[in-house]
Amino acid sequence: MDMQETTTACADAFAELASPACIDDPYPFMRWLREHDPVHRAASGLFLLSRHADICWALKATGDAFRGPAPGELARYFPRAATSLSLNLLASTLAMKEPPTHTRLRRLISRDFTMREIDNLRPSIARFVAARLDGMAPALERGEAVDLHRQFALALPMLVFAELFGMPQDDMFGLAAGIGAILEGLSPHASDPQLAAADAASARMKAYFGDLIQRKCIDPRHDIVATLVGAHDDDADTLSDAELISMLWGMLLGGFATTAATIDHAVLAMLAYPDQRHWLQGDAAGVEAFVEEVLRCDAPAMFSSIPRIAQSDIELSGVVIPKNADVRVLIAAGNRDPDAFADPDRFDPARFYGTSPGMSTDGKIMLSFGHGIHFCLGAQLARVQLAESLPRIQARFPTLTVAEQPTREPSAFLRTFRALPVRLHAQGDSPRLTSAFLNGQRGVEGGASFEHGDGERRSATDRRAQP
C-alpha cells in the first residue's frame, strides 16, 4: 500500500502490517488508518481500532459492551483451537478471563506483583545489568561490534525471569528460545507451519512448568512460583496446576520479548537524541519519563492479540461493529494519535515527567501496557528493568553508536529486532543516528550511510524535528 498515493480503501490491515514497508516503518500506514479507516474491518472479519479514544474505551469497557470469548465458543474466534495447544493456553490466561473468574485469579497473583515486591528485585536486576555490560566491554574496547540485542536486550529479561521463577538460568535460556515462535503462531494471520512451531515450543514450556511446580511443592523457595503454589485467599481458594502453568506461560510470553524490544528502542533513542540524554542523568523521575516516552513512541506489541467480543451492535466513527464481532486494538497507532499526544512523532520525555506511570502531563494514557482490568501485570517489572539499564549503559559506554544497519524481525505483531550491532566510536568519528531512523528511515549523520531498500547508498536526512 503506497501512502503517497490517494487511497480509498485497505482490504486487510493485518496483512498490510506484515508487508516489508510496514516492517520498516508502520507509522505512515497507521496514520492513514486513523484518518481514513479508524474502525477497520479486515478480510477475516476482525475489526481493528486505531484511534486513541476508541482504543481506551474498548479496553476499559466491560459488561454490556465487550467481553472475552467464552470457553465453549473458542473455536469461533480461533478456528484452529481444537488442535492447537498454544491457542488453548492463550484462552486459559488471565488476559482472556472476565469477572468473576478474572477477579479471583488477579487477586491471587497481584500481591506478588506489587511495586514493593518488584522493587525488591532491583538489586538483582542491577547486578545482572552490570554483569552483561562487563561481558560486552572487552570486545567494544577492542573496537569490535557487539550485538546489543542478543548480548543485552534478550539476555536481561531471561536472567530476571529465571530469578523471578526460581529456576536455573540455562533452563530459562532454553525456554526463551521458543517465545518468538509462539508469539508468531498466535498472530491472526499465522500459517499452519507457524502454529505448529508455536505448539512445539508451548509443549516444551508446559512440560517444564509442570515439573517446576512439582519441585516447588516439595522444596519451596522464595520465588514467585513457590509463592503462587501456596497462594490462597481468605476462602482458602488456591490456584490449580493448570491455572499455574497457563499463568507462567502467559507471564513469560507477555514480559520477555516485549521488554527486550523496548530495551532496543530505548538504546536507539539514546543514540538518536543525544540532547535528551540528560533525562537519564538526573533524578528517577527523569529516567521514568524517558522510559514512558520510549514505550509510547514504539509500542513493542503493535496490536492486541486478545479478542474483545462485541456484546451488541456498537457504532464507532460511523461504523457499526456487529454483535459477536472480534475486535482488536492497534496500540501503536493510538500511542501516536495527535488527538491524544501533541506532535506525536516527536520524542519528548517531558510529556511524562512528574506524572503517574503511563499518564502524560495532559492526562492521556500511554497504551503499551493496556488499560482497564486487563492492564499488564508485569508493567512495573518491565519499567524497573529499563530504569536500571539505561543510565548504566550511558555511563559505561558514553560513546556507543550503531555499527551497521540493525535488522528488524519481520513480524506484524512485535516491533523488534534480529540484531542491533553497536560499537564505541573513536574521537572525531561520531556518527549519530537520526530521529528518523527510529521511524523506519535508515541512516546516520556524520558522513556515514546505510544501504536503502532500492540498493542506493546515501546519507540520511532527518524527517522529524529534533527537540
From Swiss-Prot:
As cofactor, the record names: heme
The ranges of region (Disordered) come to: 444-467
What are the alphabetically sorted keywords of the record? Heme, Iron, Metal-binding, Monooxygenase, Oxidoreductase, Plasmid
- One Pfam family cited in the UniProt record for this chain: p450
Q: Which residues bind heme?
A: 376
Kindly give the Gene3D superfamilies that the UniProt entry links to this protein. Answer: Cytochrome P450
Q: PROSITE patterns in the record, alphabetically?
A: CYTOCHROME_P450
Q: What is its EC number?
A: 1.14.14.-
Family of the protein in this entry: Belongs to the cytochrome P450 family.
What this protein is reported to do is described as: Cytochromes P450 are a group of heme-thiolate monooxygenases. They oxidize a variety of structurally unrelated compounds, including steroids, fatty acids, and xenobiotics.
The entry's protein name is: Cytochrome P450 BJ-3 homolog
Source organism (scientific name)? Sinorhizobium fredii (strain NBRC 101917 / NGR234)
